[in-house]
């Protein structure tokens, strides 16, 4: 999978210690994009599932993996393979995508949390944002507020 960068964080997913993976490439051209420099699908570096497993073993405190971008949904086969690994490692999986939930639904088998919608300058933490938060409850998905997510966490 083409990856632009990887970092750790505590903000992107409430109540989790997160390994943030910035997927390389995005077809959307959101005005004010935070990461316009990683839109090109040919940039970044190729990372295998095996290499990711080794990397995660070096971060034993991580409880969640969060896909940011770029947009990982434009690498669907690789995204699903990585997410299967993350679930086997008992990690939560969060996905930020500029696409809408219904368009990426088939990619969500091993995902716990989705933040969807193009960036329009208002963060998902603001109730007036166009972006939506979807949380998995067993086999059902529910659209919740950021405040609810802060209370409940992604699991």
Model regions and ranges:
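Classical nucleotidyltransferase
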Residues: 108-155
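Canonical radical SAM enzyme core domain
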Residues: 40-53, 73-113
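Flexible loop residues that form catalytic
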Residues: 38, 70, 118-119
């Amino acid at each position: 999978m083409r990856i632009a960068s990887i970092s750790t964080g505590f903000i992107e997913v409430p109540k989790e210690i997160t390994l943030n993976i910035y997927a390389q490439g995005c077809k959307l051209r959101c005005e004010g994009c935070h990461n316009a420099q990683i839109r090109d699908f040919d940039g970044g570096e190729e990372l295998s599932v095996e290499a990711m497993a080794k990397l995660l073993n070096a971060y034993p405190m991580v409880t969640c993996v969060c896909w940011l971008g770029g947009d990982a949904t434009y690498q669907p086969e690789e995204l699903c393979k990585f997410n299967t690994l993350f679930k086997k490692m008992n990690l939560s999986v969060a996905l930020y995508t500029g696409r809408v939930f219904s368009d990426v639904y088939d990619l969500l088998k091993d995902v716990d949390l989705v933040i969807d919608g193009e960036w329009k300058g208002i963060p998902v933490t603001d109730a007036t944002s166009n972006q939506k938060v979807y949380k998995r409850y067993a086999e059902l998905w529910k659209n919740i507020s950021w405040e609810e997510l802060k209370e409940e966490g992604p699991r």
